Structure formats: C-alpha cells, structure tokens
C-alpha cells in the first residue's frame, strides 16, 4: 500500500501522472503533423518536450509505487488490460450505442478485443518468467542478439552475446 493511500496527495499524484502521460502522447502526435508539414525543428521540439513529459510522468508513477519487478509489472499490465476489455470498453460501447454513435461503439468493441490479446500476451510472458522459459526452450531455437544481430542456435540463449557482450 502506498504511503499516500486515501490522501489528496495520492489523487494529485494520479492526476499529475495522467496529465503528463496525455501531454506526452499529444506532443508525439503533434510532432508527426509538424514533420509531415516540413517543420523538422518544431517536430524535434515536440518530441523533446514529449520526452520531458515522459520523465515527469515516470516520477509521479514511481512515487505512487507503480513500478515493480518485471513479473509484478506484467501482472499489473495484465490486470489493466483485463479491466479495459471486460469492463471499460464494453461499458463505453453500450453508452455510445445508446447515444447513437454506432461507429464509435464498434471501435470501442474492436479495441476491447485487442486489449484482450494484450492481456493474454502479458500472461504468457509472466508464465515464461515464472517457469524459467524466457531464455530457454525445449528444442533447438534460433536466438538473435538484439544489439548486434549475432545468431546463436541452441536450447538456451547465451547469458551474454559472444560478439558484443550484450546481456542475453
């Protein structure tokens, strides 16, 4: 439990995290438009500011205790995706349809289906961690270094790349 639980400060931290996160996304979208319109310098400034906003959001999220181990993060991510597809998007689709916005309702439903896939992906990755399968397979597998591209064939990935010494 967060030391801020139940306080106005907790609400403020959550609002700050949400605001900075939304600003980051908006500035990234704005950068795309500026770049398409030929304003490279403005696009670069939007992206730099988006990076700043990302760090601000991370600060508040960490303060709320939102960042854990990879296994904890996968559990939290799966739970968030589950809430989105089982509740949030279903309810939003019902409301949109009741208000006559069928196209938006359909989009909410379609995105909900994607969120279900996200949950399943996170749970599979969590299972891989829990069963020590991230860097091992039951059969010969091609492992490619994500840094230099070295190809290794075997039942387990090397702990470090023999070419560039990048961790597995």
Over which residues does each language-model region extend?
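Non-heme di-metal
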Residues: 1-168
């Amino acid at each position: 439990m967060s030391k801020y639980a139940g306080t106005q400060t907790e609400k403020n931290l959550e609002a700050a995290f949400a605001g900075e996160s939304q600003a980051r996304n908006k500035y990234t979208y704005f950068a795309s438009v500026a770049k398409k319109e030929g304003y490279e310098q403005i696009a670069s400034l939007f992206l730099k500011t988006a990076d700043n906003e990302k760090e601000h959001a991370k600060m508040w999220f960490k303060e709320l205790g939102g960042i854990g181990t990879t296994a904890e993060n996968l559990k939290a991510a799966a739970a968030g995706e589950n809430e989105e597809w089982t509740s949030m998007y279903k309810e939003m689709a019902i409301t949109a349809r009741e208000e006559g916005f069928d196209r938006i309702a359909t989009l909410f439903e379609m995105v909900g289906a994607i969120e279900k896939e996200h949950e399943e992906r996170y749970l599979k990755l969590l299972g891989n961690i829990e069963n020590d399968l991230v860097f091992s397979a039951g059969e010969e597998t091609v492992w490619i270094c994500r840094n230099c591209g070295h190809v290794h064939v075997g039942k387990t990935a090397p702990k470090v790349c023999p070419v560039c010494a990048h961790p597995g």
